[in-house]
Amino acid sequence: MNLFRFLGDLSHLLAIILLLLKIWKSRSCAGISGKSQVLFAVVFTARYLDLFTNYISLYNTCMKVVYIACSFTTVWLIYSKFKATYDGNHDTFRVEFLVVPTAILAFLVNHDFTPLEILWTFSIYLESVAILPQLFMVSKTGEAETITSHYLFALGVYRTLYLFNWIWRYHFEGFFDLIAIVAGLVQTVLYCDFFYLYITKVLKGKKLSLPA
Amino acid sequence: DSESKPKDEL
């Protein structure tokens, strides 16, 4: 494992825990898209079914279990515990426009036509667009709390670092996985606009708000 | 190669 990959995983973990803590401490999930969080829970579940079939390392197993557990906890906080604070009126992205095309694509473009491989591929495609309901919500309300911005930034940095990891692996190991790379590129591009706003506004101590 | 391997990435 190279440094980019490790820092990418840490950034991903930081994002997930940051969101959990934000909701827990403020006792509120205002401004958070429950739909994006459900999509991420689906992504982790579909991808990490190999927990039951394949042992890779203690690190790998622990991270997968933590990601899944945190993800389901977040969904539970939004739709059950702090349901009264959930901003459903602004969380109106139609997720079927993401789930259906990525599911069809996973059937058509995959490495191997087996159930686990198709589910893995589906999770890669779905992850690349799963943040759209959240970004849509931010654009609809025109603003995001600073801590939500930090969450989005850490989440975007994670896949960006994975891109460097893949360049590294291609160069030093001759390994590449085109499905992951293309989806990872799409995922990173979706964050670019947000990265710009984050760097120009949030890092200068301003709240992220979009021009009306 | 781009073939299916044990998935060591997260």
Swiss-Prot record, chain A:
Site (Important for recycling of cargo proteins with the sequence motif K-D-E-L from the Golgi to the endoplasmic reticulum): 193
Chain ranges passing through the membrane: 5-24, 33-52, 59-79, 93-110, 117-135, 150-168, 179-199
Highest rank taxon of the organism: Eukaryota
Subcellular compartments: Golgi apparatus membrane; Cytoplasmic vesicle, COPI-coated vesicle membrane; Endoplasmic reticulum membrane; Endoplasmic reticulum-Golgi intermediate compartment membrane
InterPro entries per the UniProt record, alphabetical: ER_ret_rcpt (IPR000133)
Post-translational modification: Phosphorylation by PKA at Ser-209 is required for endoplasmic reticulum retention function.
Primary subcellular site in the record, as a coarse category: Golgi
UniProt entry keywords in alphabetical sequence: Cytoplasmic vesicle, Endoplasmic reticulum, ER-Golgi transport, Golgi apparatus, Membrane, Phosphoprotein, Protein transport, Receptor, Transmembrane, Transmembrane helix, Transport
Residues with Phosphoserine modification: 209
Disulfide bonds: none
Residue ranges annotated as Cytoplasmic topological domain: 25-32, 80-92, 136-149, 200-212
An annotated GO cellular component: endoplasmic reticulum membrane
Pfam family, one: ER_lumen_recept
Record note on what altering residue 209 to A does: Inhibits coatomer/ARF-GAP recruitment, receptor redistribution, and intracellular retention of KDEL ligands
Function field: Receptor for the C-terminal sequence motif K-D-E-L that is present on endoplasmic reticulum resident proteins and that mediates their recycling from the Golgi back to the endoplasmic reticulum.
UniProt similarity note: Belongs to the ERD2 family.
Protein name: ER lumen protein-retaining receptor 1
The species this protein was found in: Homo sapiens (Human)
Gene that this sequence comes from: KDELR1
